[in-house]
Amino acid sequence: MASQVSPGVILRERDLTNVTIVGSSTLTAALASSFQKGPIGEVTPISSLKDLVETFGTPSESNAEDWLVASEFLGYGGRLAVVRAETSVLNATSDGTAVLVRNESDYQSGVGSAEAFVARTAGTWGNSLKVVAVDRGADQILTLASAPATTTANTAFTTVGGKAGRIYSFDSATNELAVILENPGSLITSTDVFDEPGDGIVSAVTFAAYTGVGSQNGSHTSSPSGGTGSGLQVQAIIDVNGVVTSVTVQAGGTGYTQGDVVTVPAADLGTGASADLSVTIGTVSNDNIAISSVKDWYTNTKITGTELTLGAIGPRPGTSVYASSRGISYDEIHIAVIDTTGDVSGAASTVLERITYLSKMTDAKSAEGASLYFKDIVNLQSEFIYTSGTLTGLVEPTAAGGAEAFGQASTAFTTGDKFLLAALNESTLSGGVDDYSYTPGEVNAAMDLFADTEATETNFILMGGSMGSESDTLAKAQKCVAVAALRKD
């Protein structure tokens, strides 16, 4: 807008805030500060405000002055060399035992390697993350007519028709039992009958006539041998004449059949006993449970705390071509990172990243010869996490058991081997800590990284904002001057 206030004199109003300095894209300024996230103790090149936000997060009240200086320089077309100062920040981890992983080199040296998952950089932002590891997992979810007595994960079971597998999980509110089948090609239907684990529990016995000697008088507890089951414990009462008057069940065991004959050894029948006692299994419980309905586990299982099903990560993993060619099964695994709170993405339950069709085998390769091992790929490609420790809560894929642990090379396997299953393995990260208030020593240590002219090219040293006291501000300013003088460029 222009106005003429006197003859021949014109005033023009011009916005200079968006002026771009010619040649500014070749100018680089150095800045050290505290940030919401990002690597600590290393120089990071930044070319735009978008780049700054993606790498170091959004500004806070505590670092607003430094942030303004950075954004203004970038706004005029310049570039930045940024160092995040090391303050009392910590990385969030899968078990909540926070550690400080300064940068990728720090992690590669072993810092944080005991954790299954660690947030890529320090700060409370990592407390929003949930890491989901999922493989082929369970096969089906059975809705049972009643709750089985045994619902412990990894417990072997069969149907009355002989379909075998292991229990993965049980929801007592709905009587839904997730199961892993030994033969996934033969699915359970609602016409099958669930043969409850723990069948053959003894509740009553009879015993053969027995007369010993008076010194056997008393109560004697024994775990008899024989029969089709195990775990039975009985108590025999012998009177003053050495006669067995009763035998009662103390622990029913499992797997017994009515009519089984078991033996209480003489050694368990008191002083002077010379004969064994014969006991017959009289009553056992064999509760079979009707199956009301059946559905697929993978497509109907939700990630805890979200409405996302596992299908939001990717199709069900199975066995890679590499493993299959060696007779090995169930090596594939997906890894996904979920924003549980929305603090990272702006929307809760957002899938921040998904890395699919990885392998549990250390030497697995793609068709192009690249590594497929899940730890290698996650540590190389993920923007949000590192992984190194061991996943817990793994389950057997077959009733026979004996599946193999993650993290082995193919040479450790024989044809027919299977990997243990992670199924749905969730890790909510916690323990991350922010600290925006840096001391002169902390920010000065960060500025020292700009002193090497060979490692960092810069045209300016930006002081940023003032500190909490005049003396601290002066110390910060003097450090900027000292670094500039040392560089002499």
Specify the residue positions occupied by each region the protein language model found.
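A glycine-rich, acidic short-motif signal
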Residues: 336-338, 355-361, 421-489
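Long, low-complexity, polar/charged, intrinsically disordered or flexibly structured peripheral segments
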Residues: 284-319, 378-446
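Short, glycine-/Ser/Thr-/acidic-enriched flexible segments
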Residues: 122, 254, 269, 342, ...
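Conserved, function-critical positions that sit in or immediately flank catalytic
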Residues: 149-292
